[in-house]
């Protein structure tokens, strides 16, 4: 009798090299275990006292951050179930800017508690149904827990209520300086609502960040206009402020056009050689004179600037700035109202832009060029100049500012101004309300609903752990503060009890109104929605089929042992 070797199921269906994992092999438990590893990594980075991670990506770049979306984007994750959560955090980052850690941690905790339900015998379908019922109930309860609303979106003090908690979750200790910078920059570009109830248009691209090494964070400033981290090319470094100046933007090189193929020129005598160079000079001189005759006083070049062209531009008193980034060119065109030109020549009046002033400033040891374009009190763009000791720290501060600016974008949505209690107070209140809802639900679905409520405990527990508090004391005190109403207190006073990360009280509980710690309703709703959908998506998968990767054999990553020229 011949020996029968075991074969992979569906071996004749797919090409050689595929992998298949089904629930019979315990794939859902393995997927939850893989997600748990990532969940534990992001857990310690949540909250104002969250720890940073040093990540070296595949290009060798060093990133220091505690933002979940940034960490997951730089990591080379290959597990397909984990990638579902990575996409969820990316969606939260794109739409809301803040709450990425909440999405990752809540989705991971929902899957952690679902593992217990699976071991009890509940099917994935029942867990998904219970989670969806609890999610709908949670979103309704959040509307009833609103404790404030930002009505005047042009008021800096009102904006600080929303910007400060977002930035403090990333850069705790520097939130006062950074939130002031962001609110000032936003107030420069945010148009005033013409009538009551009108939502002003806000573009996150209107806030730019320029990082300059040296100094400290307290030396950071906000400038109305656009700042480039380089100085003009020629002798003209600044333009006066007494009038508006015409600006021409070119995406082509400011130089003599060269042929794509090589050519040979035969010169018989010295006069022919002189005439050859004179023709080039006359051609460039004529082009620059045409531009100067149009009244252009500033040229922004997206490519190289030739020495001969620069000589004639200096003669005509035209300021020349080289901006290699096409994205910066696009923003500058929007600020000045100019049209980028792909050809070298005199622009038409419609293609020219206007700028109020262009000047060169020295900040630290660097020379920067400032383009100011103001319309009364409102500018089309505003730039935050950041100062710091290390490039990694400046990059992390820039990410915190981006989150604060994105929060302002969420504020401009129809229901974006509503605020919820922060510091874990909302989650503690949701636990009791969802648990009571689960007790009223008949059947096995109540088990999934109650576990959905248990998952929210991860937020206050993590805030207390990262702050160095005793979780076994803080959590019972929080539950007691939300369930006991003091005599003479307002009915909603218990909603304001959150985690005291500073440890000022013995109980570890504080009134969040003292520090104005609030969360945005729109951000919280979106995060709970995305996290629940990601968790239910992973639970609904019963089989993972992975095809063989395309491409040939890869070179080994590490160095070969022995001498480099040794033959095999």
Swiss-Prot record:
Molecular function GO labels: ATP binding; ATP hydrolysis activity; ATP-dependent protein folding chaperone; unfolded protein binding
Residue(s) of cross-link: Glycyl lysine isopeptide (Lys-Gly) (interchain with G-Cter in ubiquitin): 15
Main location group: cytoplasm
Modified residues (Phosphoserine): 505
Domain of life: Eukaryota
Localization: Cytoplasm
Record-annotated membrane-spanning stretches: none
Keyword Nucleotide-binding: yes
Biological processes per GO annotation: chaperone mediated protein folding independent of cofactor; protein folding
Gene3D superfamilies for the chain: GroEL, GroEL-like equatorial domain, TCP-1-like chaperonin intermediate domain
Pfam families attached to this UniProt entry: Cpn60_TCP1
GO cellular component, one term: chaperonin-containing T-complex
UniProt keyword annotation of Electron transport present: no
Keyword entries, A-Z: ATP-binding, Chaperone, Cytoplasm, Isopeptide bond, Nucleotide-binding, Phosphoprotein, Ubl conjugation
PANTHER family hit by this protein: CHAPERONIN
Protein purpose: Molecular chaperone; assists the folding of proteins upon ATP hydrolysis. Known to play a role, in vitro, in the folding of actin and tubulin. In yeast may play a role in mitotic spindle formation.
Family: Belongs to the TCP-1 chaperonin family.
Subunit structure: Heterooligomeric complex of about 850 to 900 kDa that forms two stacked rings, 12 to 16 nm in diameter.
Name of protein: T-complex protein 1 subunit theta
Gene: CCT8
């Amino acid at each position: 009798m011949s020996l029968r070797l075991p074969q992979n199921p569906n071996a004749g269906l797919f090409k050689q090299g595929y992998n298949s994992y089904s629930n019979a092999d315990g794939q859902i438990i393995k997927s939850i275990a893989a997600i748990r590893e990532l969940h534990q990594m992001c857990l310690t980075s949540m909250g104002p006292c969250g720890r940073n991670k040093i990540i070296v990506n595949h290009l060798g770049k060093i990133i220091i951050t505690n933002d979940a979306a940034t960490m997951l984007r730089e990591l080379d994750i290959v597990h397909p179930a984990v990638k579902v959560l990575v996409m969820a955090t990316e969606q939260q980052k794109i739409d809301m800017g803040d709450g990425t850690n909440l999405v990752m941690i809540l989705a991971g905790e929902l899957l952690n508690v679902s593992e217990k339900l699976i071991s009890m015998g509940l099917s994935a379908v029942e867990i998904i149904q219970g989670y969806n019922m609890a999610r709908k109930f949670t979103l309704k309860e959040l509307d009833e827990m609103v404790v404030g609303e930002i009505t005047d979106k042009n008021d800096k003090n009102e904006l600080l209520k929303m910007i400060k908690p977002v930035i403090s979750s990333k850069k705790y200790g520097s939130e006062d300086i950074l939130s002031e910078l962001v609110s000032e920059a936003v107030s420069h570009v945010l148009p005033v609502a013409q009538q009551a109830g009108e939502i002003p248009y806000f573009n996150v691209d209107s806030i730019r960040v320029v990082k300059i090494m040296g100094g400290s964070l307290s030396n950071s400033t906000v400038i109305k206009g656009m700042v480039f981290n380089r100085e003009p090319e020629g002798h003209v470094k600044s333009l006066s402020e007494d009038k508006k100046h015409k600006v021409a933007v070119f995406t082509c090189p400011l130089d003599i056009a060269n042929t794509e193929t090589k050519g040979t020129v035969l010169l018989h005598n010295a006069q022919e050689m002189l005439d050859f160079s004179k023709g080039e000079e006359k051609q460039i001189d004529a082009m620059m004179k045409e531009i100067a005759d149009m009244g252009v006083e500033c040229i922004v070049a997206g490519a190289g600037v030739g020495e001969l062209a620069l000589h004639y531009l200096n003669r005509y008193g035209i300021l020349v700035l080289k901006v290699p980034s096409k994205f910066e060119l696009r923003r500058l065109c929007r600020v000045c109202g100019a049209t980028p030109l792909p050809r070298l020549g005199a622009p038409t009046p419609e293609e020219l832009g206007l700028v109020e002033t262009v000047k060169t400033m020295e900040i630290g040891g660097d020379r920067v060029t400032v383009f100011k374009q103001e319309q009364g009190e409102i500018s089309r763009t505003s730039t935050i100049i950041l100062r710091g000791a290390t490039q990694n720290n400046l990059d992390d501060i820039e990410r915190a500012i981006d989150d604060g600016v994105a929060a302002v974008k969420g504020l401009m949505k129809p229901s974006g101004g509503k605020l919820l209690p922060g510091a874990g107070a909302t989650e503690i209140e949701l636990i009791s309300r969802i648990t009571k809802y689960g007790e009223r639900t008949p059947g096995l679905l109540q088990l999934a609903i109650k576990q959905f409520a248990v998952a929210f405990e991860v937020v206050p527990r993590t805030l207390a752990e990262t702050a160095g508090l005793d979780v076994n004391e803080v959590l019972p005190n929080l539950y007691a503060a939300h369930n006991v109403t003091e005599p003479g207190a307002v009915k909603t006073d218990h909603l304001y009890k959150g985690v005291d990360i500073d440890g000022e009280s013995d109980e570890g509980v504080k009134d969040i109104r003292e520090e104005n710690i609030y969360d945005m309703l729109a951000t919280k709703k979106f995060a709970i929605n995305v996290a629940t959908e990601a968790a239910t998506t992973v639970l609904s998968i019963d089989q993972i089929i992975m095809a063989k990767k395309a491409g040939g054999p890869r070179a080994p990553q590490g160095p070969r042992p022995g001498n480099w020229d040794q033959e095999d």
